[in-house]
Amino acid sequence: MVKKLLTILSIAATAGSLSIGTASAQDAKAGEAVFKQCMTCHRADKNMVGPALGGVVGRKAGTAAGFTYSPLNHNSGEAGLVWTADNIINYLNDPNAFLKKFLTDKGKADQAVGVTKMTFKLANEQQRKDVVAYLATLK
């Protein structure tokens, strides 16, 4: 009886840890739903209030063709900011703070002035991860 109970508890613990791991993984399907909030200003294939986001993962900041960026965003790209998954996840939490810290860390605090056009903040870390997984699917 005790052996059977231990087996059941072991299986339950394993299943629980699997579901916890799955919940924290990036989910492009969930990210697509989160992206609907972004569509107020963004599309994958054309510039609007914000730049086109197709191909953003891996792109140098401030370089979407035909989009006029704020000096803060442009300067970040000139200083070497590339939109890796981690950088986008951190940026979405607080765009202005992220860019200013990036420039300051690069020794360019004098260029860390003004604000980016991106006023939206996405506080939920899982949603940020999910939306980045979705952005990675856009070409």
Swiss-Prot record:
InterPro entries assigned to the protein according to its UniProt record, in alphabetical order: Cyt_c-like_dom, Cyt_c-like_dom_sf, Cyt_c_1A/1B
Keyword set includes Electron transport: yes
Sequence positions bearing Pyrrolidone carboxylic acid: Q26
Signal peptide: 1-25
Coiled coil segments of this chain: none
Residue numbers binding heme c: C38, C41, H42, M118
Disulfide bonds: none
UniProt cross-references to SUPFAM superfamilies, sorted A to Z: Cytochrome c
Alphabetical GO biological process terms: photosynthesis
GO molecular function: electron transfer activity; heme binding; metal ion binding
Post-translation changes: Binds 1 heme c group covalently per subunit.
Pfam families: Cytochrom_C
Keywords recorded for this protein, A-Z: Electron transport, Heme, Iron, Metal-binding, Photosynthesis, Pyrrolidone carboxylic acid, Signal, Transport
Family: Belongs to the cytochrome c family.
UniProt name for this protein: Cytochrome c2
Native organism: Rhodopseudomonas palustris (strain ATCC BAA-98 / CGA009)
Lineage, opening ranks: Bacteria, Pseudomonadati, Pseudomonadota, Alphaproteobacteria, Hyphomicrobiales
